[in-house]
Amino acid sequence: QQRYLNAKRYVKLAIVADRSMVTKHNGKLKKLRKWIYRIVNTINEVYRSLNILVALVYLEIWSKEDLINVTSAAKDTLASFGNWRATDLLKRRSHDAAHLLTNIKFDGTTVGKAYVASMCQQDSSVGINQDHSKINLLVALTMAHELGHNLGMSHDVVNTEKQCNCGTCVMAPTISDQISKLFSNCSKNDYENFLTLYKPQCILNEPSKTDIVSPPVCGNELLEVGEECDCGSPETCQNPCCDAATCKLTSGSQCAKGLCCDQCKFSKSGTECRAAKDDCDIAESCTGQSADCPTDDLQRNGKPCQNNAGYCYNGKCPIMLNQCISFYGSNATVAPDICFNYNLKGEGNFYCRKEQATIFPCAQKDKKCGRLFCVLGPTGKRISCKNTYSEDDPNYGMVDLGTKCEDGKVCNSNRECVDVNTAY
């Protein structure tokens, strides 16, 4: 648990500057870009104390017209921006969170708004920020604050039982003249709780050099174009393989970090760098030519797993028993065959396939690839065939694809029970 919490995280940030920002900078896009790069550099600096690096991986400037309706109603603007991000921006560029920068004044004293505990979520990993000051640092701290909300942090409330011992930290409810780049103990707790509860996966992946669109800064701990390594400032760098002043490897070093970097040299070929997580995963080993561990690879589909209870499918071992347990709890088991006869009817929710409104009943041999049936506890003479479905998700409550339906057979994407050797 502690190792999970202490792992380095990378927020790959997309920033959108709207038309009002272009007007504010008199159409000088180069000047506007510089302003934004400075903001991101500050945000990265602020978050390094939490072992988070923030990298700008995309910058979009709406120089002709706004692609959403940006208004003084912060709540509405945030909702439209979240929607646009999910339906448009995410399809064009992969990123973890998107923030809007606008010169439009929001109602009341609001200078920013963001969804809380939403990092990595498709339509809510967003924030909106007003470019409210001539002082770059103040705007940067506003965006850092809104990003804090995405990462699960609530406001530091003074005089509560929580005792957030910091009046001017990043998550203070209002901006004050005393500028602080620090997070309170409450913010740190909120962030750790967010990691534990939501387990956001997207921020575990490091951006590649070419993903980062801002000019390289030696000493920001991000590996960028033109750098061989980046271990932070000369004062804080603890890495003997990297020269902090130049971001080049020290003499005789082959690498500065990586799962296959050992004491500044590439690990020997064949050294295991990622153990197999389970039956359907493969262990990876170093090549001897690189500091990176090869891409995480999976066992082939159809390989027996969990003592022949199932067959691997896309890195998982789908078996009906586990599906029943996930729906009904630990005393659930797979129902007897007689329950699966409902799938032969092709009525209501009992079928193998549904295309538009047409329902296709299961053939006798495929009945265990349709709706899943489970029983709870010991069964007496009367069997209660439990099943579940959802109006919103047609696959919910169906037997998972790749599940073993008979010895040597699995459910394919057409929900037919077919030979495992020819299924994939």
UniProtKB/Swiss-Prot annotation:
Disulphide-bridged cysteine pairs: C120-C202, C164-C186, C166-C169, C218-C247, C229-C242, C231-C237, C241-C264, C255-C261, C260-C286, C273-C293, C280-C312, C305-C317, C324-C374, C339-C385, C352-C362, C369-C411, C405-C417
Chain sites annotated for binding Ca(2+) 3: D281, E284, D296
Modified residues (Pyrrolidone carboxylic acid): Q1
Keyword Transmembrane: no
Glycosylation, residue list: N69, N185, N331
UniProt binding sites for Zn(2+): H145, H149, H155
Comment on pH dependence: Optimum pH is 9.5.
Molecular function per GO: metal ion binding; metalloendopeptidase activity; toxin activity
Family of this protein: Belongs to the venom metalloproteinase (M12B) family. P-III subfamily. P-IIIa sub-subfamily.
UniProt name for this protein: Zinc metalloproteinase-disintegrin-like brevilysin H2a
